[in-house]
UniProtKB/Swiss-Prot annotation:
It comes from Crotalus durissus collilineatus. This is Venom phosphodiesterase CdcPDE. InterPro entries: Alkaline_phosphatase_core_sf, DNA/RNA_non-sp_Endonuclease_sf, Endo_G_ENPP1-like_dom, ENPP1-3/EXOG-like_nuc-like, His-Me_finger_sf, Phosphodiest/P_Trfase, Somatomedin_B-like_dom_sf, Somatomedin_B_dom. A divalent metal cation 1 binds at D283, H287, H440. Pfam families: Endonuclease_NS (PF01223), Phosphodiest (PF01663), Somatomedin_B (PF01033). CDD domains: Enpp (cd16018), NUC (cd00091).
Length: 829
C-alpha cells in the first residue's frame, strides 16, 4: 500500500525539548531552535513560559512533562505532587477557593493522615490595618479570609514597632524587654557586642531569649518548619526548627508558597505540624513610596495573590478547611518627610553621644563599654525637655516611659528614649537623608502602626470580628491550636478564647495569697502624738463613731463601693485590713502604712464642692494602732512630700461625711508637683467621666516598682528605697475607672459588658513631662494621663492585686476586659 505522507509539524504541544532531528519536517521545539530560527510559532507559549509561570493555562493543560518548569500541568501532576496550584481549576473545571462559599461550620474537614490540623503562621511585613479598611475590594483573597474567618479590627504591635522586635514577640509571647531583641540595632554592654540585622552577630544565640513557638512544638513531640522568621535560623537554646530556610530576600513569593505546600505533601512521619511563611511586602514598597501611593496598592495585590496561591494549593490537597491559618503583620507604616525632622544639633552645641536615629530613638555614650554606666543620661533628658514652645518629641529616662510600653527592664534598652510625634523623626544632624517615603517604629498606640490579624480554619469561629488585642497574645493562641503547653510568657492565657471554636485552655481564677486581717474600732489613742490637728471638728466622738459600721452598713457599703468584687491580694505575707466607710472602702496595709487600694462609686450627680473648713484638717484613724499609722509629723513643711488623699474628701454629700475621708488611713505621700495633676484629675476629670458614662467605680492606689521590671516590688526592695521619712514613696499611682458599656445603666445595675479606663501615673516631683510648671491644669492634665493609659492587667502585675473577682461572667470575658488598652491618640490628617 501507499504510505501516508508525513505531515509537517506545526505546534510544540507535547513536543517541548524534543531531540532535534534533521529528518523531521516542519518547525522545531528543541532548546536550540531559536538559534536556528526554526521554532514553531507556539514555542514561546508552550515551552518557555511554563518555566517562568506559576500557573496553568488551557494551552498547558495535559502538557507533556517539561524539564525546569516551576510547576506542572501534566495529567500525572497530582500523582507526582507538582501541579500548579490552579491546576484543578483551570484544567479540571473545579471552582477556585476564591469562588467557593465560606466553609460550613461542620466538623474539621481533613483528609486521611491528618489527625490534627496543621497551623500556618503567615506574616506580611508592614501590612497596616488601615490598608485593609481602605482597599479591601482590591484584595479579594484577603477579603474572603476576613469575611469567612475571624479577624480583629487591628492587632497592636509592641514598642518599638520594628520588624525583628515584633516577629520575635509573636513567636515567643514576650515583650522585647523580656526576649532581648529590643530593636533592629542594639548594643549589649555585658556581651560588649553590637547587634544589627545585616551582621553575623545576629546569629549569636546570646541575643535571643525566651522559647519560640517552633521550639515549644518540637519539645512536645511536634515538627516545625519555618520559611523565614526572625530567630528561626539561630541556634536558640542549642537547636533549630525541624526544617528552616536561611533568609534570602531574592526568593520569589511563589517559590516560598510552593515549598510550604511541598512540606504539607511529605509523608506523615516527616510532615511538620507548624509552619511559618514570611513575605517582605507591603513593607518594602511602603518604605520606598510611603503608605499612601499607587505602588502600595500594587504591592498589596501582590501579597493578596500570594495568599490566593496558598489557599488554592491547600484546596487542591483538600486541606483548605483542615489547616488553621493565621495571617498577620508585625507593624504598620507611617508617612515621613525631610521637612519633619528634629535635629539634636539644635539642642546641643556638640552632639557628643551615640544616637539610634529615626522614629524610636535612643541615646547612649559613644565610648562603650568604658563610659556606658557613667554617661549623664539625666543631663541629656533635661537638655531635651521643654526647650522649645513646640517640640515634636518627648525625652524620657527608660524607667519613666509609659508602663504600657514595657520598655525598661533590659540592659540593652538605653536610658535615654525619645517618644516622637506621628510622621516626625529625631536625628543627629543634617547628614541624615533617609527621610522620604515611609517608616515605622513609633508609639504602638498610633493608628498607623496597627497591624492586621486574620485567622481561618476549623479551629476558629466563622464570620467573626473581634476587638483589637496585643500581639503578645498570639503565642498562647498558637499553643492552644497545636494543643501545647506554653512556655512562661507575657500574654494572658485565655484572653483570646473568643476567637476559638472549642477553646483548648480554660483559665482558672487567681487564688488570694493574703486574706484581710481585722482592724477593730478602738478608743482615740492618748496622748495623741500624731501631730495631726483639725480645729473644725467640734464633736470628735460623733465624727469617729461614723467609722464604726455595723455588719449591715458594711454590707451596704460593699454593694455600693465594690460592685465587681473586692480586689484580692496576690502578694504573700501581706498584712492589711479592710476599712469600711459609707462612701468608700480601702485595704490599709500595715507594711507600707497606707492603703493598697481604695474603692468608691460616684454617680453622674455626685457633688464635688470643697468644704472650706476641711482644707487643713486631718486626724488619726481610730481603727489603726498608732504604731501602724502614718502621722502628720511624717510630713514636715520643708519636705517635697505632702499628704494626698486616695478617696477625695470633697466627694461628700454632707459636712459630717467629709470627715470620713480626712483620716490618716486615707492619705498617701505625694510630691507637691504631682498633687496638681492628682487633684485636677479627681475634682474635674473623674466627675466629667462619671457624667459621660452614667457613673463610675473608681479604684486607686500606690505602685512600687523601683527596679522598673513591671512587677510589684517586694517589701524588702521597697524598704531599701525609703529615705528621710519612714513612709515609702510610691513610684506610680494607679486609677481604674469601670462603668457600664450600656450607658443607660449605672455601675451598680450593669447586666451587660463593662467598660474600663485605667491609668498608671508616674509619681514625679515636677510636671516637666508636660512642660506645665506654670500652665493651668486644664491645658495639660488630661493629655498627660492619656499618655499613661494602661491595661488593668498592667495594674495587676504592678500591684499584686486581682480585680473583678466578683464578676459573674465567664473568666475569659473578664480577661478580655483586663487586657483592653484604651487609646486616645488622634490620627494625623
Amino acid at each position: 500500500g501507499l504510505k501516508e505522507p508525513v505531515q509537517p509539524q506545526v505546534s510544540c504541544r507535547y513536543r517541548c525539548n524534543e531531540t532535534f532531528s534533521r529528518m523531521a519536517s516542519g518547525c522545531s521545539c528543541d532548546d536550540k531552535c531559536t538559534e536556528r530560527q526554526a521554532c514553531c510559532s507556539d514555542y514561546e507559549d508552550t515551552c518557555v513560559l511554563p518555566t517562568q509561570s506559576w500557573s496553568c493555562s488551557k494551552l498547558r493543560c495535559g502538557e507533556k512533562r517539561i524539564a525546569n518548569v516551576l510547576c506542572s500541568c501534566s495529567e500525572d501532576c497530582l500523582e507526582k505532587k507538582d501541579c500548579c496550584t490552579d491546576y484543578k481549576t483551570i484544567c479540571k473545571g473545579e471552582t477556585s477557593w476564591l469562588k467557593d462559599k465560606c466553609a460550613s461550620s461542620g466538623a474539621t474537614q481533613c483528609p486521611a493522615g491528618f489527625e490534627q490540623s496543621p497551623l500556618i503562621l503567615f506574616s506580611m511585613d508592614g501590612f497596616r490595618a488601615g490598608y485593609l479598611e481602605n482597599w479591601d475590594s482590591l484584595m479579594p483573597n484577603i477579603n474572603k479570609l476576613k469575611t469567612c474567618g475571624t479577624h480583629a479590627k487591628y492587632m497592636r504591635a509592641v514598642y518599638p514597632t520594628k520588624t525583628f522586635v515584633n516577629h520575635y514577640t509573636i513567636a515567643t509571647g514576650l515583650y522585647p524587654e523580656s526576649h532581648g531583641i529590643i530593636d533592629n540595632n542594639i548594643y549589649d554592654v555585658n556581651l560588649n557586642l553590637n547587634f544589627s540585622l545585616s551582621s553575623s552577630t545576629a546569629r549569636n544565640p546570646a541575643w535571643w531569649g525566651g522559647q519560640p513557638i517552633w521550639h515549644t512544638a518540637t519539645y512536645q513531640g511536634l515538627k516545625a518548619a519555618t520559611y523565614f522568621w526572625p530567630g528561626s535560623e539561630v541556634k536558640i537554646n542549642g537547636s533549630y526548627p525541624t526544617i528552616f530556610k536561611n533568609y534570602d530576600k531574592s526568593i520569589p513569593f511563589e517559590a516560598r508558597v510552593t515549598e510550604v505546600l511541598k512540606w504539607l505533601d511529605l509523608p506523615k512521619a516527616k510532615r511538620p505540624d507548624f509552619f511559618t511563611l514570611y513575605i517582605e511586602e507591603p513593607d518594602t514598597t511602603g518604605h520606598k513610596y510611603g503608605p499612601v501611593s499607587g505602588e502600595i496598592i500594587k504591592a498589596l495585590q501582590m501579597a493578596d495573590r500570594t495568599l490566593g496561591m496558598l489557599m488554592e494549593g491547600l484546596k487542591q490537597r483538600n486541606l483548605h478547611n483542615c489547616v488553621n491559618l493565621i495571617l498577620l503583620a508585625d507593624h504598620g507604616m507611617e508617612e515621613i518627610s525631610c521637612d519633619r525632622l528634629e535635629y539634636m544639633a539644635n539642642y546641643f552645641d556638640n552632639v557628643d553621644f551615640f544616637m539610634y536615629e529615626g522614629p524610636a530613638p535612643r541615646i547612649r555614650s559613644k565610648n562603650v563599654p568604658k563610659d556606658f554606666y557613667t554617661f549623664d543620661s539625666e543631663g541629656i533628658v533635661k537638655n531635651l525637655t521643654c526647650r522649645k514652645p513646640k517640640q515634636y518629641f518627648k525625652a524620657y529616662l527608660s524607667k519613666d516611659l509609659p508602663k504600657r510600653l514595657h520598655y525598661a527592664n533590659n540592659i540593652r534598652i538605653d536610658k535615654v528614649n525619645l517618644m516622637v510625634d506621628q510622621q516626625w523623626m529625631a536625628v543627629r544632624d543634617k547628614k541624615f537623608t533617609r527621610c522620604k517615603g515611609g517608616t515605622h517604629g513609633y508609639d504602638n498606640e498610633f493608628k498607623s502602626m496597627q497591624a492586621i490579624f486574620l485567622a481561618h480554619g476549623p479551629g476558629f469561629n466563622e464570620k467573626n470580628e473581634v476587638t483589637s488585642f496585643e500581639n503578645i497574645e498570639v503565642y498562647n493562641l498558637m499553643c492552644d491550636l497545636l494543643k501545647l503547653k506554653p512556655a512562661p510568657n507575657d500574654g494572658t492565657h485565655g484572653s483570646l478564647n473568643h476567637l476559638l471554636k472549642n477553646p483548648f485552655y480554660t483559665p482558672s481564677p487567681a487564688k488570694e495569697q493574703s486574706s484581710p486581717l481585722s482592724c477593730p474600732f478602738g478608743p482615740v489613742p492618748s496622748p495623741d502624738v500624731s501631730g495631726c490637728k483639725c480645729s473644725s471638728i467640734t464633736e470628735l466622738e460623733k465624727v469617729n463613731q461614723r467609722l464604726n459600721l455595723n455588719n449591715q452598713a458594711k454590707t451596704e457599703s460593699e454593694a455600693h463601693n465594690l460592685p465587681y468584687g473586692r480586689p484580692q491580694v496576690l502578694q504573700n505575707h501581706s498584712k492589711y485590713c479592710l476599712l469600711h466607710q459609707a462612701k468608700y472602702i480601702s485595704a490599709y496595709s500595715q507594711d507600707i502604712l497606707m492603703p493598697l487600694w481604695s474603692s468608691y462609686t460616684i454617680y453622674r450627680s455626685t457633688s464635688t464642692s470643697v468644704p472650706p473648713s476641711a482644707s487643713d484638717c486631718l486626724r488619726l484613724d481610730v481603727r489603726i494602732p498608732a504604731a501602724q499609722s502614718q502621722t502628720c509629723s511624717n510630713y514636715q513643711p520643708d519636705l517635697t512630700i505632702t499628704p494626698g488623699f486616695l478617696y477625695p474628701p470633697n466627694f461628700n454629700s454632707s459636712n459630717f461625711e467629709q470627715y470620713d475621708a480626712l483620716i490618716t488611713s486615707n492619705i498617701v505621700p505625694m510630691f507637691k508637683g504631682f498633687t496638681r495633676l492628682w487633684n485636677y484629675f479627681h475634682t474635674t476629670l473623674i466627675p466629667k467621666y462619671a457624667r459621660e458614662r452614667d457613673g463610675l467605680n473608681v479604684i486607686s492606689g500606690p505602685i512600687f516598682d523601683y527596679n522598673y521590671d513591671g512587677h510589684f516590688d517586694s517589701y524588702d526592695t521597697i524598704k531599701q528605697h525609703v529615705s528621710n521619712t519612714k513612709i515609702p514613696i510610691p513610684t506610680h499611682y494607679f486609677v481604674v475607672l469601670t462603668s457600664c458599656e450600656n450607658q443607660i445603666n449605672t455601675p451598680l445595675n450593669c447586666l451587660g459588658p463593662l467598660k474600663v479606663l485605667s491609668f498608671i501615673l508616674p509619681h514625679r516631683p515636677d510636671n516637666s513631662e508636660s512642660c506645665a510648671d506654670t500652665s493651668p491644669e486644664n491645658l495639660w492634665v488630661e493629655e498627660r494621663i492619656q499618655i499613661h493609659t494602661a491595661r488593668v492587667r498592667d495594674v495587676e502585675l504592678l500591684t499584686g492585686l486581682n480585680f473583678y473577682s466578683g464578676l459573674k461572667q465567664p473568666l475569659p470575658e473578664t480577661l478580655q476586659l483586663k487586657t483592653f488598652l484604651p487609646i486616645f491618640v488622634n490620627p494625623v490628617n
